[in-house]
Curated annotation (Swiss-Prot):
Its cofactor is Zn(2+). SUPFAM superfamilies: Aspartate carbamoyltransferase, Regulatory-chain, C-terminal domain, Aspartate carbamoyltransferase, Regulatory-chain, N-terminal domain. Contains catalytic and regulatory chains. This is Aspartate carbamoyltransferase regulatory chain. Involved in allosteric regulation of aspartate carbamoyltransferase. Zn(2+) binds at C110, C115, C139, C142. It comes from Yersinia pestis (strain Pestoides F). PANTHER family: ASPARTATE CARBAMOYLTRANSFERASE REGULATORY CHAIN (PTHR35805:SF1). Keywords: Metal-binding, Pyrimidine biosynthesis, Zinc. Gene3D superfamilies: Aspartate carbamoyltransferase regulatory subunit, C-terminal domain, Aspartate carbamoyltransferase regulatory subunit, N-terminal domain.
């Protein structure tokens, strides 16, 4: 009988949030988009980690910080199979089930360079639409609709 040693590839946290099963190559973008680094707390990032589910994954751990259900659901746009776990005393005390939000405000940038959201002091605002497995976002201001990946890569 063969034995295997399993060890954590990213250090455990005592208290905070773990966002696991993020698609590989998306972790840094999520940190930036959702301003997850706007904290003095320690953040641990694992990129291209092995995953039984998808081959490779990214992982984010934020100590002493807890995502609201609304914040977690906004992550579902780009990491629909991600898990968001609340950790207390090194144990998972709550698992958030992600679902697409109806709208995303003050996070994304409209890809339309003529949109007023670029030049006016307004927060971006998108309505989320899901049809036949495709996710699109409609800008509140210019009313143009974009594939969610187009918006993800807009800066």
């Amino acid at each position: 009988m063969m034995t295997q040693d399993y060890k954590l590839q990213v250090e455990a946290i005592k208290c905070g949030t773990v966002i696991d099963h993020i698609p590989a190559q998306i972790g840094f973008k999520l940190l930036s988009l959702f301003k997850l680094t706007a904290t003095d707390q320690r953040i641990t990032i694992g990129l291209n980690l092995p995953s039984k589910r998808s081959g490779r994954k990214d992982l984010i751990k934020i100590e002493n910080t807890f995502l609201t259900e609304q914040q977690a659901n906004q992550l579902a746009m780009y990491a629909p199979d991600a898990t968001v776990n609340r950790i207390d005393n090194y144990e998972v005390v709550k698992k958030l089930t992600l679902s697409l939000p109806e709208r995303i405000d003050a996070v994304l940038t409209c890809p339309n360079s003529n949109c007023i959201s670029h030049n006016e002091p307004v927060d971006s605002s998108f309505t989320v639409k899901a049809q036949r497995g495709e996710i699109s976002l409609k800008c509140k201001y210019c009313e143009k609709e974009f594939d969610h990946l187009t918006v993800l890569h807009a800066d």
